[in-house]
Amino acid sequence: MDPLGARSCFVDADALPCWADVRDGEGEDVPDGGRKDAPHGGLHSPFPYRNDINKKVILWRGDVALLSCTALVNTSNETLTDKNPVSDSIFRYSGPELSEEMQKLKGCRTGEAKLTKGFNLAARYIIHTVGPKYKTKYRTAAESSLYSCYRNVLQLAKEQGMASVGFCVIATQKRCYPPEDSTHIALRTVRRFLEAHGAALEKVVFAVTEQEEGTYRRLLPLYFPRSLEEEQRSIPFLPQDIGNAEGEPVVPERQIRISEKPGGQDDDSEEEGLVKDLSVIGSHAFARMEGDVDKQRRLALQGQLSGAAMQKQHQRNYNRWLSRARTEDLSDIAALKALYQSGVDNCGRTVMVVVGRNIPVLLIDMEKALLYFIHMMDHVAAKEYVLVYFHTLTGEHNHPDSDFLKNMYDIVDVKYKKNLKALYFVHPTFRSKVSSWFFTTFTVSGLKDKVHQVESLHQLFSAVPPEQIEIPPFVLDYDARENGPFFPSQSSFLSL
C-alpha cells in the first residue's frame, strides 16, 4: 500500500486521452512508400470513420503493468515462464501471489488466452497469451496465431463482462515478429471486434514503448480514421490483405471456390487444369482412403480385423505423430532438459536419461512433450537402448498421469518396446514403487520385467559406468546425503 499522501504509480485508463481526441495528423507520418496526394477519389474504405469506436481506443506510451483497468494483457511463452520486460514488470508489481497462481495453470498454447487475478496490480485481472515465433517460411501460420491471440483476449474480456482491456505488444522482438506486420494484425483485429461487439467494451488501451509508438501512431489512422478526409487519405496505404469480417488473415488457396455456373461445363483451360490437379490426389500418404476408423475399432474388438491390418493402422498413426514431431517448434520443451541422450551401458546400448524434476506437468503442453519424446527417441529406438529415470526430489506437479503414459505407450512404434532392454527407476519412493507395480501389472504388462528399482547411484553404476551418464548435480547431492560416499556391497548391485 502506498504511504498516506504518496502519489500512486498507477495510471487510470479513463483519464487517458482517447484516439478521437488526438488531432487528425498530429505526430503522424505518411506510411512508407506513400504520397499525400495519392489517388483515392470514389473509393470506400473498408474501415470507415466512426467516432464512437475512436472514443473507445487509447494509444498510451507506458508500462502496461501500471494501467488501472479491468484487465491487462501479459505476453509469455507456452510454459508461462518467459522473461521479457512486460512479464517481468507484471510479476514485480502483482506480488508473489501471481507466481503461486501460475502454478495452477497448465501452461498456455500459442494463440490461446488464460485468466488470473491481478493481485497487487491496479488491474483486476491479467489475461495471459502466447504470441507465435515468426519464421518467413511459416508466415501464414504466424499471422493466424497472432490474430488468435488478440481475438481470444477480446472474446475472454467480453465473456467476463470486462469494461476495459490494456494490451501490451503481444508479438515481441524476442520472437522475431516484424513490428509493422504485427501492428497491422493488432489494430485490424481490435477494429473488427469493436465493430461487432462495441457495446461489450468501453476502453481498449494499446500500451507501447517509445520504439513501438511511432509504428502504432502511423498505422492507427488506417484502421481508426478520425475524419472522412483521413479515411480517404488512408485508403492507398492499406495492405492488400485486410482479413475477413473478423480481421482474420485470409489465405486464398484455402478458400473453397464455387463455380458461377454450377450446372454448366467450365472452359477447356479450367478443365485441363483440373485434370492436372486431380492427377496428384492420392499420391501422398495422408490422402489415401482409410475407411471408417470407428468401424475398424469395432471390428478389432470383435476379432474381425486381422493383426496385420491393426499393425498397419498403428504404423500410419505413429508416422503422423513423427511427421509433426519433425516439423513443430519444440524448443520450449527441449529447454527443460528433461530428456537427453547420454553414453552407453556395460552392454554397449544407448542410454537415454529422463529427469523427473524437470517435467512441470501443470505448466507445459503434454502433447508437445510427447512429440519431443518421439523426436528424440525415433532414431535411438531403432536399436537396443536403456532408459534411466531419475525420480529424485520430484513432486506431484512432476508426475504425468497414468492415462498419458498409457497413451504414449500405445502411440509409439513397436521398435520402442522391442528394443527397450531396461528401465532403471532411480531413487524410488514407496508410493512410486506401488504406482509403477500397478501400472506395469495391469496397464502395460509387457514392461514389467524390464523395470529395475534402483536405490542408489552406486547400484546404477553396476549397469551404466559413471563416465557414460550425465547426472544432474542435485541428484548427485541427494545421493551423497542419503547413501554416503562409499559403494555398497557387490551383492546389492543389479543383475543383468
From Swiss-Prot:
Organism: Xenopus tropicalis
A Pfam family the protein falls into: CRAL_TRIO_2
Compositional bias (Basic and acidic residues): 254-264
Protein name in the entry: Ganglioside-induced differentiation-associated protein 2
Boundaries of every Macro domain copy: 44-224
Domain spans labelled CRAL-TRIO: 329-483
Similarity remark: Belongs to the GDAP2 family.
InterPro entries per record: CRAL-TRIO_dom (IPR001251), CRAL-TRIO_dom_sf (IPR036865), Macro_dom (IPR002589), Macro_dom-like (IPR043472), Macro_GDAP2 (IPR035793)
Signal peptide: none
Domain of life from the UniProt record: Eukaryota
Region feature Disordered, mapped onto this chain: 22-45, 252-271
